[in-house]
């Protein structure tokens, strides 16, 4: 007999994979230490043994990356850079691997077009960025060295999304984004923690962008590992898109709203805390692995659970919403609001000016 809800086994599987990805399972005991050591050794081997001389291109290459598994804020940083550099007269292209997208396994260059592509093909983050930038500015290729060789002919600046671990392409400016609440991903490699790279490598960054509230202890911890200039930013909600109702509402529309929240993020707590600060009464959550999309059955299940708890709607990140496709208009589902977020660089004028001046100097030196 068919049911519109997922099986209990599938729900258990979802919860298990989320717990593993957040370092809550497999992280303890000798087995967890062994897995973490293997992960760290593999990372070190790939970097030291498989590295080759990085390829240089005529464009200025700016890398935006992190040292943890997801959830640091790379996408808002890339979008901010693309906007401010365009305002300074530069033509910018974004190079992405298209993680989790079908085209990421193909050795060909894909120009992301929101009118013809979906998240399943190009990946959620490239599709999200392409929808906010000029047409033809976001490119996906499995090998970004090859992509850069082709794209550099037509652009002043190449923004390398998630590029810190890429050693095939020479990078003129290295930016690393860290989460202010947990800058070192629990201080251990996956699965004991969320590290995907050694904190020692932070010293290689030209600038560190600290996303969100960063207490004095975490600031001292960061300074212990690197003395690179730091830019402190605050994530903020700009508006909420209710596609099924055709509405775009401001931040204050969330105050007092009873809603269920689903998201597939590397650090979901940051998003949940932001909604609480905005006045949302969260009546239930449904967490997904990073980059995973919610299924039709899961959406029906979570909508029903939210309605039973007197929820008025469902909220998700814009990145999660872009994977919904036609599910946003699925009959029998509570209204879904896609929360748009951006970084607030207020009071960081000196730090951001130093970053942009460095980019100017490097680019002018290449002419």
UniProtKB/Swiss-Prot annotation:
Keywords: ATP-binding, Kinase, Lipid A biosynthesis, Lipid biosynthesis, Lipid metabolism, Nucleotide-binding, Transferase. Its EC number is 2.7.1.130. It comes from the Bacteria. Pathway: Glycolipid biosynthesis; lipid IV(A) biosynthesis; lipid IV(A) from (3R)-3-hydroxytetradecanoyl-[acyl-carrier-protein] and UDP-N-acetyl-alpha-D-glucosamine: step 6/6. It holds the Pfam family LpxK. One of its GO terms (molecular function) is tetraacyldisaccharide 4'-kinase activity. ATP binds at residues 68-75. It is an enzyme of class 2 (transferase). One of its GO terms (cellular component) is plasma membrane. One of its GO terms (biological process) is lipid A biosynthetic process. It catalyses: a lipid A disaccharide + ATP = a lipid IVA + ADP + H(+). Transmembrane segments: none annotated. Transfers the gamma-phosphate of ATP to the 4'-position of a tetraacyldisaccharide 1-phosphate intermediate (termed DS-1-P) to form tetraacyldisaccharide 1,4'-bis-phosphate (lipid IVA). Belongs to the LpxK family. NCBIfam families: lpxK (TIGR00682). This is Tetraacyldisaccharide 4'-kinase. It comes from Chlamydia abortus (strain DSM 27085 / S26/3).
């Amino acid at each position: 007999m068919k049911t519109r809800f997922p099986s209990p086994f599938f729900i258990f599987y979802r919860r298990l994979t989320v717990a593993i990805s957040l370092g809550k399972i497999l992280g303890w005991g000798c087995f967890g230490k062994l897995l973490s050591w293997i992960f760290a050794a593999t990372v070190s081997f790939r970097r030291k043994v498989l590295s080759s001389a990085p390829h240089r291109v005529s464009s200025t290459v700016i890398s935006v990356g992190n040292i943890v598994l997801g959830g640091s804020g790379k996408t808002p940083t890339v979008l901010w850079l693309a906007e401010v550099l365009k305002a300074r007269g530069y033509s910018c292209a974004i190079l992405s691997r298209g993680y989790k997208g079908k085209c990421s396994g193909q050795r060909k260059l894909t120009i992301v077009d929101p009118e013809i592509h979906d998240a399943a093909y190009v990946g959620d983050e490239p599709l999200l960025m392409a929808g906010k930038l000029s047409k033809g500015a976001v490119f996906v290729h499995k090998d970004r060295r090859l992509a850069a060789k082709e794209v550099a002919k037509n652009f002043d600046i190449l923004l390398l999304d998630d590029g810190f671990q890429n050693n095939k392409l020479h990078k003129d400016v290295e930016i690393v984004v860290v989460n202010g609440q947990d800058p070192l991903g629990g201080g251990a490699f996956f699965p004991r923690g969320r590290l995907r790279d050694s904190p020692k490598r932070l010293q290689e960054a030209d600038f560190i962008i600290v996303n969100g509230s960063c207490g004095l202890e975490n600031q001292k911890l960061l300074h212990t590992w690197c003395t690179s200039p730091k830019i402190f930013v605050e994530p903020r909600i700009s508006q909420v898109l209710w596609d099924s109702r055709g509405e775009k509402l401001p931040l204050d529309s969330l105050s007092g709203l009873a809603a269920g929240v689903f998201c597939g993020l590397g650090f979901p707590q940051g998003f949940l805390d932001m909604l609480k600060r905005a006045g949302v009464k969260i009546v239930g959550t449904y967490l997904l692995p990073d980059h995973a999309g919610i299924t039709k059955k899961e959406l029906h299940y979570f909508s029903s659970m939210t309605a039973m708890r007197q929820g008025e709607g469902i909220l998700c990140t814009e990145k999660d919403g872009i994977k919904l496709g036609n599910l946003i208009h699925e009959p029998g589902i509570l209204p879904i609001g896609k929360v748009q977020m951006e970084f607030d660089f207020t009071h960081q004028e000196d730090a951001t000016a130093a970053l942009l001046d460095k980019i100017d100097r490097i680019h002018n030196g290449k002419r």
